Amino acid sequence: MARARCGQRFFSPPESSFQFGLLAHDAGFKEPPHYHKSVTRLIDDLQQMFVVQRGVVAVELYSDDGELLREVILKAGDAIVLIHGIHAIRVIEDMQCISVKQGPFLGLENDKVFIDFKK
């Protein structure tokens, strides 16, 4: 008899201000109705998640000194969670994606710092 799947596994450290994980439950599982407590949290490092709906996009991940560490190609249905660090996107095919990050939004002037790495 197969063991029932019931649980969650989070991949982010507990202290991270952006939590992501995997929920796995067998058919018939029901979580009781609930809401999440209102707790004041200090967020000083914005995290972001992209879910590509259509098209193709390259996500470039950089070290703090400008070294390209990795390039990840995402297609429709793919997702990436950016916890910390410098990143860029390069659109390969016309794309549309969902972007999720913490709020509130404080305006463009407070949102991004653009880096010009000299090659």
Task: Please identify what each model-predicted range represents.
Residues 26, 52, 75, 82-83, ...:
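A short, compositionally biased micro-patch
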Residues 22-44:
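Conserved short histidine dyad/triad with adjacent acidic residue
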Residues 1-24, 117:
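A short, N-terminal "cap"/entry segment at the start of jelly-roll beta-barrel domains
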Residues 33, 59-60, 80-82, 86-92, ...:
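Short beta-strand His + acidic residue motifs that chelate non-heme Fe in jelly-roll/DSBH
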Residues 63-84:
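Short acidic-glycine-tyrosine-enriched beta hairpin
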Residues 26-27, 45-62:
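Glycine- and acidic-residue-biased ligand/ion/polar-headgroup-sensing regions
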Residues 90-119:
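Double-stranded beta-helix
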